[in-house]
Amino acid sequence: MKAGPLQLGVVPPANRAIAILDFFLRPIAIVGTLASAIAMATTNQTLPFFSQFIRFRAKFNDLPSFTFFVVASSIVSAYLILSLGFSILHIAKSNLVNSRVLLLLLDTAAMGLLMAGSAAATAIVQLAHKGNNKVNWFAICQQYNSFCKRVSGSLIGSYAGVVVLILLILLSGVALSRR
């Protein structure tokens, strides 16, 4: 009976290509999540009211959903930076199963956390843009235009990170199924 490539210790080229793609997708997710956390955390706008001495200020930490978004995005960014080591390890040794399963589970948890933070922030951004007439919550984006634009922009990077994490989860699944 002839030995297969895994029995000989040879890494199949398809698994190596998946590991390389995994390594290149992680920095993209890092940039998206880290940029969105920084953009949200540095968002504020001050408006004068009647005179220069009375001002209203809008900051991201005025709303707990935005604070949760920043914390969730920061945690996911830190995880993605730390997971680059496993990604490099999989390029060198593509037949490691336990670390691939661990990455699959942690990527799924990170995607869930990032999606929860993004969804919470999206709900508040929707209220800021549209308001809610039934409970007399008025839209504030006409007054705090730059605040709303910056907050909305930070959501784009976060959702891009969610999409990349979904791709990473799929890649891990494909790599595990080829075993």
UniProtKB/Swiss-Prot annotation:
Glycosylation-annotated residues: N44
Cytoplasmic compartment residues: 1-17, 89-100, 176-179
Its membrane topology: Multi-pass membrane protein
Localisation: Cell membrane
GO biological process terms, semicolon-separated: cell wall organization
Side Extracellular, residues: 39-67, 122-154
Pfam families: CASP_dom
Main location: membrane
Keywords: Cell membrane, Cell wall biogenesis/degradation, Glycoprotein, Membrane, Transmembrane, Transmembrane helix
This protein's GO CC annotations: plasma membrane
Domain of life: Eukaryota
Residue intervals passing through the bilayer: 18-38, 68-88, 101-121, 155-175
PANTHER family: CASP-LIKE PROTEIN, CASP-LIKE PROTEIN 1U1
Subunit comment: Homodimer and heterodimers.
Family according to the record: Belongs to the Casparian strip membrane proteins (CASP) family.
Function, as annotated: Regulates membrane-cell wall junctions and localized cell wall deposition. Required for establishment of the Casparian strip membrane domain (CSD) and the subsequent formation of Casparian strips, a cell wall modification of the root endodermis that determines an apoplastic barrier between the intraorganismal apoplasm and the extraorganismal apoplasm and prevents lateral diffusion.
Listed name of the protein: Casparian strip membrane protein 1
